[in-house]
A protein has these predicted regions:
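Short cationic amphipathic helices and targeting signals
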Residues: 9-13, 74-76, 188-193, 237-249, ...
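Short, conserved charged micro-motifs
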Residues: 19-22, 83-84, 197-202, 248-255, ...
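Residue-level signal for inorganic ion chemistry
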Residues: 27, 38, 141, 241, ...
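Anion (oxyanion) recognition and catalysis
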Residues: 28, 90, 208, 262, ...
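Short glycine-biased active-site loop of nucleotidyltransferases that positions the nucleotide triphosphate
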Residues: 44-50, 229-232
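C-terminal substrate-binding/cap subdomain adjacent to the FAD-binding core in PCMH-type
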Residues: 113, 132-298
Length: 398
C-alpha cells in the first residue's frame, strides 16, 4: 500500500528482465499507472498518488549476474536485497559502500531509486559513485543500457546517475553494475560526548578538516543516544565516528581523534570495538523505524541538505523552533556531509496535524541557509498542506 492506497489492478511479478519489459509495455499501451516496488521500505516518501493501477514487484529479480572479485566489480538484478548482496561479497572480504535502512528487506533497485542514504558517505562517497553501469526499462517498455562492468574513465554522459533518487519516474531499474570496496583489516568506532551543542559540531568539522579519514560520522542528542543504545546523560551531545584501515593507520586515527576531542572540550571518549559497534550503526541507520522505546516510530521525518558550514546554525534554529512547539523530537546530523535528519514523535494524528506551521517554519530556516528540506514521512492528512519536496524553492515563481 502507498499512503493507504492499493493497486486497483493488482501486482505483476516478473522473474527476469524481459518479463519486466513486457509488463511495462502492456501498462503503457493500456494507459495504466504502475509503480515499481522492491522491499516497500520507502513507499511513504512523496505526494499521494492520483492513480495507482499496478504494483510492479521486482523482488523476484534477485540474482547476482556476475561477480569479479579480482576486479572489484559485480552486476546484480535490482530485486536482490542489500544484505543478501553484502553476504555474497563478504566471502571475498569486500563490500558495497551503500548502507541504506532495513537491508534485510530493502532491495538494491529501491535503495538507489529512492536515494536511501546511510552513513558511509563521509569517506566512500554517495551511492551514485558506486554505480558503473545500469539497465533500465523506459515507460514504453524499451530497454536502455548505460555504462558497463569495467571501472575506467570515459567521456560522455553517465545516464545511470539520473535514475538514482528519481523514484522510478524516469524508468525502472532492472540491473546494476557496481564497483566494490575491500573491507578494512581493522575497524572500530569512537563515541565522544560533549556538554555543549556547539562543541560537538566544532569537533565534527575539525575531524572533517583534519587528517582523519573516517568511514562515517554522526552527531546526535541524548534522545538519539538512548534510542541507539548509548547511555548518555540528558542534555549531552554525542559524536559517533567509524574508522577503518590497517593496524598502524587505525591507531594513528584514534590518537588524532582523541587529541581533537580533548582540545574541543569533550567530556568522555570511548573506543568501541568492531563486534560492539555493529548494533550501534545498525540502530542509527534504522533510526526512523525503531519502535522499541516509549516514543515509538517518528510520525514525521525531515531530511535537510546543507553545506557543512551551515549545519550547526541551522540545527540550532530548528531545535529552537521545535522546543517552542513542545513536541518530542530528535535530530541526527552528518556535519561533514551537510545532512540533518529531523525526527518528530507524536501519538495522536490530531496533535501532529497541528504542526503544519511549525514544519513550514523549519523549512524557511533551512532555505535561509541555502539548503533544501524534504519530508520523507508525513501523516497522509498533512501531505496536502505541506510541500513534501520543497518545490517552492526550486520554482520560486510558483
Amino acid at each position: 500500500m502507498i499512503d493507504g492506497a492499493k493497486p486497483s489492478k493488482g501486482f505483476r511479478v516478473p522473474e527476469n528482465f524481459d518479463e519486466a519489459c513486457e509488463v511495462v509495455l502492456a501498462a503503457h499501451d493500456a494507459k495504466e499507472v504502475f509503480v515499481p516496488v522492491g522491499g516497500g521500505t520507502r513507499l511513504e516518501v512523496g505526494h499521494p498518488l492520483s492513480k495507482y493501477d499496478i504494483a510492479l514487484d521486482m523482488s523476484y529479480m534477485n540474482d547476482v549476474i556476475s561477480y569479479n572479485p579480482a576486479d572489484l566489480t559485480c552486476t546484480v538484478q535490482s530485486g536482490i536485497t542489500l544484505s543478501a548482496l553484502q553476504n555474497n561479497l563478504r566471502e571475498y572480504n569486500q563490500f558495497l559502500a551503500v548502507d541504506g535502512p532495513k537491508p534485510d528487506i530493502a532491495t538494491i533497485g529501491g535503495t538507489l531509486a529512492s536515494s536511501a542514504p546511510g552513513y558511509l558517505r563521509w569517506n566512500l562517497g554517495h551511492m551514485r559513485d558506486t554505480v558503473i553501469g545500469m539497465k533500465m526499462i523506459m515507460s514504453n517498455g524499451v530497454a536502455v543500457k548505460t555504462g558497463g562492468q569495467v571501472v575506467k574513465n570515459v567521456s560522455g554522459y553517465d545516464m545511470a546517475r539520473l535514475h538514482i533518487g528519481a523514484f522510478g519516474s524516469l524508468g525502472v531499474i532492472g540491473e546494476v553494475s557496481f564497483k566494490l570496496t575491500p573491507i578494512s583489516s581493522k575497524e572500530g568506532s569512537m563515541c565522544v560526548t560533549f556538554g555543549q551543542f556547539e562543541d560537538a559540531h566544532i569537533f565534527s568539522l575539525n575531524v572533517f578538516d583534519g587528517h582523519v579519514m573516517p568511514l562515517a560520522l554522526a552527531c546526535f542528542d541524548s534522545c538519539g543516544a538512548s534510542r541507539i543504545g548509548i547511555q548518555g546523560k540528558s542534555g549531552r551531545w554525542s559524536v559517533l565516528i567509524k574508522i577503518g584501515s590497517r593496524e598502524k593507520a587505525f591507531e594513528r586515527q584514534v590518537s588524532i581523534i582523541q587529541d581533537l576531542a580533548g582540545r574541543n572540550g569533550s567530556e568522555s571518549i570511548e573506543l568501541i570495538r568492531q563486534e560492539e559497534e555493529i548494533p550501534l550503526w545498525d540502530a542509527l541507520r534504522d533510526f526512523g523505524s525503531n519502535c522499541q522505546d516509549t516514543l515509538g516510530a517518528p510520525s514525521i521525518i525531515g531530511r535537510a541538505y546543507l553545506t557543512p558550514s551551515q549545519v550547526k546554525d541551522c540545527e540550532k534554529d530548528i531545535r529552537r523552533i521545535l522546543l517552542d512547539s513542545q513536541v518530542p523530537f530528535s535530530i541526527l546530523s552528518q556535519p561533514g556531509f551537510g545532512t540533518l535528519l529531523v525526527y518528530i514523535f507524536g501519538g495522536e494524528t490530531s496533535e501532529v496535524f497541528e504542526l503544519t506551521e511549525t514544519l513550514n517554519e523549519i523549512r524557511l530556516s533551512v532555505n535561509r541557509g541555502s539548503g533544501e528540506l524534504t519530508f520523507e514521512r508525513l501523516p497522509i492528512q498533512m501531505k496536502n498542506n505541506v510541500d513534501v519536496w520543497d518545490e517552492s524553492r526550486s520554482n520560486p515563481k510558483s
